Curated annotation (Swiss-Prot):
PROSITE patterns for the chain: MR_MLE_1
Highest classification ranks of the organism: Bacteria, Pseudomonadati, Pseudomonadota, Gammaproteobacteria, Enterobacterales
Molecular function, one GO term: hydro-lyase activity
Entry protein name: L-rhamnonate dehydratase
Record-linked PANTHER family: ENOLASE SUPERFAMILY, MANDELATE RACEMASE (PTHR13794), MITOCHONDRIAL ENOLASE SUPERFAMILY MEMBER 1 (PTHR13794:SF58)
HAMAP family for this protein: Rhamnon_dehydrat
Note: Reaction proceeds via a syn dehydration.
CDD domains the record matches: MR_like_2 (cd03327)
Length: 405
């Protein structure tokens, strides 16, 4: 009988944060909204708060960057470590160090599903269906996958069964699809700048933006709109039809996450050939099942917010059973290792984090070292051939550990 590899147990879990309301501003990292001034990601983008004039010009004005980056590190008995980042900041540190630690330490490094289920069950009474707690659980889950991969010496995508394609092709999210085309991306997704409180004038302005980019990018380059939960069904339907002449590929996250009936109605009334997408701010498998039943075309979970890689794999299987696509929201290497194994993810998202979208900057810069960026809009699977997620923690960042156990 052949010997079976003996796996170590987890000895320590630690949680740090950078950025957020109680630290330095513009820290970037896992909270990619936490950028400095003059950045496209904070420039008059439509949000649920845009109806209040005091908060319509800047997303940071209503506190989109108050959480900061959570960094979770798990250490095995053999002193190998795995880590991950998400958006949960100092509050996420408390949850990890004062609650979730009991489900992690002492477990085998391969006990990922057990730990995941225990974290979900133990936080159910205060987690709801997503948000800060789910972000924290996601971060722990990703750190566990990173550790497991490093212990066995395999990239995470091989732990999931291996790649189903040689490379990942990307569209770019940012204010300049025309620049994205020059960089080799297959499409460009722009934020909307106006909402229902702006009436038909807002629709005309955003449609004019799409028309301008269509002229600059030519007839075949994909163009999409990201509405970031800022609209109602009536406005979203009108906007979709106003943009249809310019071959808009999809309209994204028009409504708040809980408005499932609204998504069903929007899908029913959208122009023929235009896709309706959502999922970035949904958490838990159950919420994605309900979202899938609305008939939307693409589900877009964020692996750092939806419950981690363990949940993302379940969401992809759910979508596949219904003939739907899964195209995760950003998330860099944490998505790369998943989507290259999914048969229903033909492309992926790259979030432009350079201020004017003119250069390629790693999404979670500066917290990750060796974080890859697309070359000519693509990342080959060989780039992912490093143990775990293939990145290291930049300990030169101002890491703060406010709690311990």
């Amino acid at each position: 009988m052949e010997n079976i590899m003996t796996l170590p147990k987890i000895k320590h879990v630690r949680a740090w944060f950078i950025g957020g309301a109680t630290a330095e501003k513009g820290a970037g990292g896992g909270d990619y909204h936490d950028q400095g001034g003059n950045h496209w990601i904070d420039d008059h983008i439509a949000t649920p708060m845009s109806k209040y004039r005091d908060y319509e010009q800047s997303r940071q004005s209503f506190g989109i960057n108050v959480l900061g980056t959570l960094i979770v590190e798990v250490e095995a008995e053999n002193r190998q470590t795995g880590f991950a980042v998400s958006t949960a900041g100092e509050m996420g540190c408390f949850i990890v160090e004062k609650h979730l630690n009991r489900f992690i330490e002492g477990k085998c490094v391969s006990d990922i599903k057990l730990i995941h289920d225990q974290m979900l069950g133990a936080t159910m009474y205060y987690s709801g269906s997503g948000g800060l707690v789910m972000n924290t659980i996601s971060c722990v889950d990703l750190a566990l996958w990173d550790l497991f991969g490093k212990v066995v010496g395999l990239p995470v995508y091989k732990l999931l069964g291996g790649a189903v394609r040689d490379e990942i092709q990307f569209y770019a999210t940012g204010a300049r699809p025309d620049l994205a085309k020059e960089m080799g991306f297959i499409g460009g997704k722009m934020p909307t700048h106006w909402g229902p409180h702006d009436g038909d004038a807002g629709i005309r302005k955003d449609a004019a933006m799409v028309a301008d980019m269509r002229e600059k990018c030519g007839p075949d380059f994909w163009l999409m709109l990201d509405c970031w939960m800022s609209q109602d069904v009536n406005y979203a339907t009108k906007l979709a039809h106003a943009c249809a002449p310019f071959n808009l590929k999809w309209i994204e996250e028009c409504l708040p996450p809980q408005q499932y009936e609204g998504y069903r109605e929007l899908k029913r009334n959208a122009p023929a050939g235009m896709m309706v997408t959502s999922g970035e701010h949904h958490g838990t498998l159950q919420s994605f099942r309900t979202l899938a039943e609305t008939g939307i075309d693409i589900m877009q979970p964020d692996v750092g917010w939806c419950g981690g890689l363990t949940t993302l794999v379940e969401i992809a299987a759910l979508a596949k059973s219904r003939g739907q696509l899964v195209v995760p929201h950003g998330s860099s290497v944490y998505s790369h290792h998943a989507v290259i194994t999914f048969t229903n993810t033909p492309f992926s998202e790259f979030l432009m984090t350079s201020p004017d979208c003119s250069t390629l900057r790693p999404q979670f810069d500066p917290i990750l070292l060796d974080e890859p960026v697309p070359v000519n809009g693509r990342i080959h699977k060989s780039v992912l051939d490093k143990p775990g997620f293939g990145v290291e923690l930049n300990r030169d960042c101002h890491l703060k550990r406010p709690y311990s156990h």
